[in-house]
Amino acid sequence: MKQNHNLSLRIIFTLCLLSVWSAWLSAQPKREVRAAWITTAYGLDWPHTRAISATSRERQKAELIKMLDKLKAANFNTILFQARTRGDVLYRSDIEPMNAILTGKVDGDPGYDPLAFAVEECHKRGMECHAWMVTLPLGNRKHVAALGKKSVTKTHPKLCVSYRKHYYLNAGHPETKDYLMSLVREVVQRYDVDGVHFDFLRYPDKARRFPDSYDYRKGGNGRSLAQWRRDNLTEILRHIYKEVKKIKPWVKVSTSPVGKYRDTSRYSSRGWNAFNAVYQDVQGWLGEGIQDQIYPMMYFRGNHFYPFALDWKEQNNGRQVIPGLGIYFLHPSEGNWSLDEIERQMNFIRAEGLDGEAHYRAAFLMEQDTQGLYDLLVDQYYTYPALQPAMPWLDAEAPTTPTGLHIERRQDGSVHLSWNASQDNDPDNTPMYVVYASDTYPVDITRPEHIVAQNVQGTTYTYTSILPWDNQKHFAVTAIDRYGNESAPCQGQP
């Protein structure tokens, strides 16, 4: 009872602080994840144009560029780009067909590789791009029929089951993890993704009659059905995590689990939680170290949000917890939440030291019906850039400090910077660079307002101030690796 009382007091105390010190709490940390999900299923966020000609292809690409430009302008640093939906993909795969949303035809060729394009455009803007992959659901009967012979239900029928008029990969089949890893391997080997992000790595809701009894009898080995199912999901994730780290150890492996792990000691999940309802042992995954990040889908408010966010934080095992915020509820047709609901949640996330937040979904950051959320982020919460949180459990050694920073002030008012390259302890991990600017010397790199560019690839950068009176006098450059380790600065001479 004392523990319950203490938890309640902590939540109440924190919420009181939020109301009194909201301006202070919105002070921006140098490192946090600022993510947006870009949903390609049904073209919800992108694309809205079908690529059936050279002109329409460029229009389709321009739609994504416009979205990325707006997210970059708001200092987002992470894009969760949906690269696999329901047994079809948005990249050139040898295993599954191209999604029809691109051209109007199953496995149609849009004339470019959407995932490669998304990665390239994100990196141009200093943002990470994670390949968001729906894992087990394969779609309803109509969708599967449309894929025809290219559907996994035809190419690997023994891995698939039908349940409530939908098809799923069977997590209880021992070869399912290998099939999923074959898809992940394509993505990680062929593309310069910063992460792979797994969605729907769970059983369907109310899955008591899910048709896996044969596999359970064969492989249950005395475990309860519930525990066997949890172990199946854990084994899939364990296998993928280990294999990804063999290929590119810096690639982040994450999931988007159900937003509440279990009932807390005081607050009920009302039957909808990861552990019991859909068999996700997420805290077990964190404890075992087979997750770098989790993005729990915390599309709730009040006591359905705050105590469960604390629960994730307290069980994180040093891994990154980035709550997913249901910003779509701000829309009048979705829930018409008031903007201060999301504002309180973001303040709470910073006050409690979580690792950032993700916004579901990108279109609701673009529309005006979300009650000014985008402007709020630009003006108060994401005014300055933020670096990615580091991953010391993978690598804690910073690159060497770049040297020889040369500053050339040009007649057009721009400043051209160049420097000598840094070196990293991992020869496959070429360092990137962060550029800082200030009107005082030496430049204080602990202050996020001094960041003018991050994840710069190459050893040159041209700085142009937006406003003439914003022109900075002094510059510094650091090297940063893909684990988030940052070197000491190379300061430009005053």
Language model regions located:
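Aromatic-lined carbohydrate-binding/catalytic grooves of carbohydrate-active enzymes
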Residues: 74-110
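Substrate-binding cleft of secreted/luminal carbohydrate-active enzymes
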Residues: 282-305, 319-393
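Solvent-exposed loop/turn segments flanking beta-strands in beta-repeat/beta-sandwich domains
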Residues: 422-448, 472
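Beta-strand-rich modules
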Residues: 463-486
